[in-house]
């Protein structure tokens, strides 16, 4: 099994778990959190698609992992943290290890928009990944607006701390789109033609949603 195949399998595990989480949270009316998992689902599918076509993707995933390790180690050492001498030394060793491996240029960050274009998932990036970042993942006015009602007519403005189904349909539709795309890529890439007919039937059902 190649590194790309291994990572694609792991990404599919994350895709599946995030997809299931979207459904469970949407059923409870927790749309903000459901959309946060929609972004996670979309991100994993973008990665799977990029792994199929871009031989540099496994190395980029390693580099982004090391970039996060480097930033955290620097933050712990330079911040106002009560680190023990042993813990501080551990962070210095991480920094030394990564600098020795990558030199002054350091590890690279993944450009997910570019990878989505490479892997044929640009629409998924815009509709699911990017939109869910604005109204689900991050604390923005769009996210906070879900908890407030302006009031209509004589009704007073009020807080809405109760289940939300304002864009339930599109959230589930986009989650299904991401999941079906992942299955399409993997059945083709891993040579699983026995599942093509079942997948086509699922896609037709999705189109009727």
Placement of each model-derived feature along the sequence:
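A cross-kingdom marker of C-terminal helix-rich interaction/assembly modules
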Residues: 1-209
């Amino acid at each position: 099994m190649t590194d790309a195949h291994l990572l694609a399998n792991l990404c599919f595990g994350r895709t599946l778990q995030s997809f299931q989480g979207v459904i469970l949270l949407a059923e409870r009316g927790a749309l903000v959190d459901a959309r946060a998992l929609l972004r996670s689902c979309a991100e994993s599918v973008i990665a799977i698609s990029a792994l199929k076509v871009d031989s540099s993707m496994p190395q980029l995933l390693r580099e982004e992992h090391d970039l996060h390790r480097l930033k955290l180690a620097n933050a712990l050492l330079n911040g106002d943290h009560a680190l023990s001498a042993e813990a501080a030394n551990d962070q210095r060793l991480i920094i030394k290890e990564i600098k020795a491996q990558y030199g002054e240029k350091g590890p690279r960050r993944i450009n997910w928009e570019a990878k989505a274009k490479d892997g044929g998932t640009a629409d998924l990036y815009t509709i699911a990944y990017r939109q869910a970042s604005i109204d689900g993942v991050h604390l923005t006015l769009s996210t906070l607006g879900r908890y407030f009602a302006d009031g209509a007519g004589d009704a007073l403005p009020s807080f809405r701390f109760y289940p939300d189904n304002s864009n339930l349909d599109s959230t589930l539709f986009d989650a299904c789109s991401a999941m079906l795309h992942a299955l399409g890529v993997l059945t083709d890439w891993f040579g699983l033609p026995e599942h093509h007919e079942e997948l086509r039937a699922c896609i037709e059902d999705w189109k009727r949603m």
